From Swiss-Prot:
Protein encoded by which gene: hlh-11
Gene Ontology molecular function: DNA-binding transcription factor activity, RNA polymerase II-specific; protein dimerization activity; RNA polymerase II cis-regulatory region sequence-specific DNA binding
Sorted UniProt keywords: DNA-binding, Nucleus, Transcription, Transcription regulation
Record localization: Nucleus
Disordered: annotated span: 88-109, 226-311
InterPro entries the UniProt entry points to: bHLH_dom, HLH_DNA-bd_sf, Max-like/E-box_TFs
Protein's UniProt name: Helix-loop-helix protein 11
Role of this protein: Transcriptional regulator. Component of a feedback loop involving atfs-1, atgl-1 and hlh-11. Binds to the promoter of the atgl-1 lipase to negatively regulate the expression of atgl-1, and thereby promoting fat oxidation in response to mitochondrial stress and mitochondrial respiration in the intestine. In addition, functions with atfs-1 to maintain lifespan. May have a role in fertility and in positively regulating body size.
Length: 431
């Protein structure tokens, strides 16, 4: 009877040991490692089993076995050694061990299993989330966009297929990658068009700058004319040159004329220059014995670009110098004149100048001799334009002038220029 009870207890212990082995195998499969397990000392179990039936009863045997299990030393063994008696017998009895799971209640054992399972699941989800984060970093990201795990997997698959397609296009069947063709012609055409556009803008700005500079120059000259307008009332004394003519000061000549008619500063008009400027000064020969020979007749030719310039008859005084006053674009002389006049007329060719000299010589001869005989002109002067010298010192001079006019009209015919001044000019006689 006692031995049967001991056999039942041994079966209970062995069953508990196998139960622990299955639990430990489950923990090892989940990656938790060795689990500390407490097993009763094998010697105490053997002594309890080999006790004689006459000494101890069933109750005393159970108490002995329980007391032997409680008082025996505990040891921590790996799960692989559970259920192996020889290894348990050779363990050191000096190492203490915690309570065995067999001594715990079922609720605590189930709670421990749940904690182990939760830890394993947590580690598994962390590894999965880390993989999805890595895939999300490779995908193109938009601001504020949130993707689920399924969307991340779908976009990753699409990107992989797209990259595989590009790889097939870039690498032909031979395995050598294609060389990228640079669109040099297209870029060159764009650059040429841009250069042409910039050149057009530069030319436009340059033309505008030149126009503005010319306007600034004209405004400066106009300002200079207004500042020198106070000098218009002051008399201007022409300077006598070596050839018997008179010239105006260069400063007055440059400021008295209007701005469009003024020449460049490098070359200013002078009255004695007959080749470079339209203003020419011609001297008429007079009688060497007359008192008017000191102020002989001189003809000024203004530039042809002055249609509104007035024709002025100037009578110089016997005593030089002659004072000329100019107050506007038209020329005038306030000083009294009594000798042969100085006539401003339009510019004529050189042969016409010879005709003027011939006519002036005839007038001077008529003035000195007192007759009014017509003067015959050379035949080589026919067909050219001519002008006349108007003098009013006496009636004889007027008759001689009429004779010269009739002779010129007879020689030139229809080419004769009327004696009256043009409509744009005015003749003013200053006495």
């Amino acid at each position: 009877m006692v031995r049967s009870d001991s056999a039942e207890e041994d079966q209970i212990i062995i069953d508990d040991g196998f139960d622990l082995t299955e639990e430990d195998e489950e923990m090892m499969s989940s990656g938790t490692g060795a689990l500390p397990v407490t097993i009763a000392d094998w010697n105490s179990v053997t002594n309890a089993r080999m006790a004689p039936p006459s000494i101890m009863s069933a109750a005393s045997a159970f108490d002995l076995t329980a007391s032997g299990m409680q008082n025996s030393l505990r040891s921590v063994l790996p799960t692989s050694t559970i259920g192996h008696a020889p290894m348990l017998a050779n363990r050191s009895l000096s190492q203490p061990a915690p309570l065995s799971p067999t001594s715990l209640d079922p609720d605590r054992r189930s709670r421990m299993r749940r904690q182990i399972a939760n830890c394993n699941e947590r580690r598994r989800m962390q590894s999965i989330n880390a993989g999805f984060l890595a895939l999300r970093a490779l995908l193109p990201r938009k601001e504020g966009e949130k993707l689920s795990k399924a969307a991340i997997l779908q976009q990753t698959a699409d990107m992989v297929h797209q990259l595989l397609g590009h790889k097939g296009e870039d690498i032909p069947d031979g395995g050598e990658p294609k060389k990228l063709k640079l669109e040099e012609d297209h870029h060159d055409a764009d650059h040429q068009a841009q250069i042409a556009h910039l050149q057009t803008i530069l030319e436009t700005e340059r033309a505008a700058r030149k126009a503005l500079e010319s306007q600034v120059i004209q405004l400066r000259e106009l300002l200079q004319m207004t500042t020198t307008s106070s000098q218009a009332s002051s008399p201007v004394t022409p300077r006598s040159n070596g050839s018997g003519g008179f010239t105006l000061p260069s400063s007055y000549a440059s400021s008295a004329l209007p701005t469009p008619l003024r020449e460049s500063p490098e070359r200013k008009p002078s009255f004695q220059d007959t080749t470079s400027t339209p203003l020419s000064l011609l001297t008429l020969n007079g009688s060497p014995t007359s008192s008017e020979s000191l102020a002989s007749q001189r003809i000024f030719h203004p530039p042809p670009t002055l249609p509104s310039l007035e024709t002025t008859v100037i009578r110089p005084t016997p005593l030089p110098p002659i004072s000329v006053e100019i107050s506007s674009p038209s020329l005038s002389t306030p000083s009294p004149l009594t000798a042969a006049p100085i006539i401003f007329s339009t510019a004529v060719p050189t042969q016409s100048s010879i005709l003027f000299q011939t006519a002036a010589a005839a007038v001077t001869s008529a003035m000195s001799t007192g007759n009014s005989t017509p003067v015959a002109l050379p035949h080589h002067l026919q067909g050219h334009n001519s002008a006349f010298v108007s003098t009013q010192p006496s009636l004889t001079l007027s008759q001689s002038m009429q004779t010269i006019v009739e002779a010129i009209r007879h020689l030139e015919g229809s080419h004769f220029i009327p004696t009256s001044p043009p409509p744009t000019s005015q003749t003013s006689l200053v006495r």
